[in-house]
């Protein structure tokens, strides 16, 4: 295992920890701009989920429990880090392709529920690795 201290200190997308934390912070910012009740967010009508990036993100977050179990069974925490990096990549693609704060309340709340679920996964995955999940960067 080679640890690159210079890479670990960088604050850009080449640093996998920064990349994951940045996804978490981006989600925090969108939810902050919305300023609604996050506890009440849920997907109310799955028919609005049609975007390929949404489907990829849903698939990615659904794989979290299995990724954690496998990492624990194999004593391989790096697998969690690899999973989180892939999940963050799916989120960043979705973020770059999607408007979240839109007039259609149903679609907006479904999208916000999806990114909130993603934020939950990223935060808990980072926590398992002993890494912070900042809301701002």
Language-model features: where?
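Non-catalytic interaction-recognition regions
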Residues: 1-137
